[in-house]
């Protein structure tokens, strides 16, 4: 029986997953690194070092389909970690790692990463025609109603501006086909959005640089 041919992205993800599994089972790694017994005296920053394996030591993810978590909104991070722990959100890498996080550390991890500076991924701004299409789609769907004017998000709503392009594209499509099921409202909105419009949104949001606007009040 012939094995299915993996796309470049799928092959890269599989290689990363295999590497981590060969080093140690993810659940064991999580248990060792996040156990309050093993690391009771260590600061949360020490425990967070595992996260850099995928999310990057300076906040720049090691792969294009991995999200930025540095500077992400604290409430959003809390909800996603809880959803990974409960199984409401599933991912081959994150699910077993989140399962090993002490429940008492979930809020601390979210607070820690939310206070770090959002990195510039050096993603090019969308061309004018793509930006116009994306802005029209965002207005039609009502994205700014939750993600705010600069797509910076707030509270339990994610920042989208400057997020990894491939992650944005995959996430919106996962909501659309309900592969990701921890936000039914987003699934409904993306189901009503065409793949072409989703592509424009991903390109537009990835290229947004908003720090200058967010810092105006400081």
Predicted features and spans:
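Extracytoplasmic/secreted proteins, especially bacterial periplasmic and envelope-associated proteins
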Residues: 50, 76, 93-96, 108, ...
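Short, Lys/Arg-enriched N-terminal segments with co-localized hydrophobic residues
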Residues: 2-15
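N-terminal signal peptide c-region/cleavage motif recognized by signal peptidases
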Residues: 35-37
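Inter-heme linker and motif-flanking segments adjacent to c-type heme-binding CXXCH motifs
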Residues: 60-61, 115-129, 149-159, 176-183, ...
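Sequence/structural segment immediately N-terminal to covalent heme-attachment motifs in c-type
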Residues: 40-58, 126-149, 164, 218
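Gly/Gly-Pro-rich "capping" loops immediately C-terminal to redox-active cysteine motifs
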Residues: 44, 59-89, 95-100, 139, ...
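C-terminal capping alpha-helices of c-type cytochrome domains
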Residues: 99-122, 166, 191-218
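Bacterial N-terminal signal peptides that target proteins for export
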Residues: 14-26
């Amino acid at each position: 029986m012939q094995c299915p041919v993996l796309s470049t992205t799928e092959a890269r993800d599989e290689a990363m997953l295999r590497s981590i599994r060969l080093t140690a089972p993810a659940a064991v790694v999580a248990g060792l690194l996040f156990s309050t017994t093993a690391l009771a005296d260590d600061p949360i920053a020490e425990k967070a070092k595992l996260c850099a394996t995928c999310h990057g030591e300076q906040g720049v993810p090691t792969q294009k389909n991995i999200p930025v978590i540095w500077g992400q909104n604290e409430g959003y991070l809390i909800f996603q970690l809880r959803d990974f722990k409960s199984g409401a959100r599933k991912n081959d890498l994150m699910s077993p790692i989140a399962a090993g996080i002490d429940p008492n550390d979930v809020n601390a991890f979210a607070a820690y990463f939310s206070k770090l500076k959002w990195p510039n991924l050096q993603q090019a701004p969308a061309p004018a025609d793509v930006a116009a299409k994306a802005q029209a789609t965002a207005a039609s769907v009502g994205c700014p109603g939750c993600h705010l004017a600069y797509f910076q998000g707030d509270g339990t709503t994610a920042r989208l501006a400057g997020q990894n392009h491939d992650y944005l594209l995959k996430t919106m499509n996962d909501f659309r086909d309900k592969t990701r099921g921890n936000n039914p409202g987003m699934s409904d909105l993306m189901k009503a959005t065409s793949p072409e419009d989703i592509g424009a949104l991903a390109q537009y949001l990835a290229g947004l640089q908003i720090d200058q606007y967010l810092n105006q009040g400081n």
